Amino acid sequence: MRRDFDRRQKANAVRKKVEYSKRLNENRIRVLQAREDAVQALLRDAQASLLSLSLNTAEYSRLMLSLIVEGMHKLGESPALIRCREIDVPLVESLMPQVEAAYRAAHGREAPNVRLDTANPLPPPPRNAEEQSSGERVFCSGGVIVTSSDGSIECTNTLDDRLRIAYMGNLPALRGMFDT
């Protein structure tokens, strides 16, 4: 009878430890999920900011000038092709004289020959923030891709890619902000 009582008592203690461990793990999972939800909310806010940035004509124009010059410098090839969204074609065309001057000023040499690749535009922007976060279709919030004339070398300077790179590079720090 004593052995039976001890066996039941040990089984009861094991069951309590298992229950405690199960509750502890469930709480850990809830905390991790809440932290991941908060990080994803930050990403969605940043994506929404990209949408509004491309609507601010003056600021977006300055940004596009910088992105094109930077892409041309990184590529280091001549001639080069610039790909942009269809809605950005007039802007990029109007920036071409400024691009050459900015490149010359920044790098102290003549700008490479570039032309706009209108045959292969980047995807259009998302219509709203919900579409942007849904992932149902490919979109581009702005920026350019500068490629070599044969397309073998590509410098992606789109806002979405820059956000993705910044997000991935800072993900540990972002998650750390929500540690308890």
What do these predicted ranges mean?
Residues 29-180:
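Elongated, mostly alpha-helical coiled-coil "stalk/stator" tethers of large membrane protein machines
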Residues 1-25, 29-36, 40, 44, ...:
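Amphipathic heptad-repeat coiled-coil alpha-helices used as elongated oligomerization/stalk/scaffold segments
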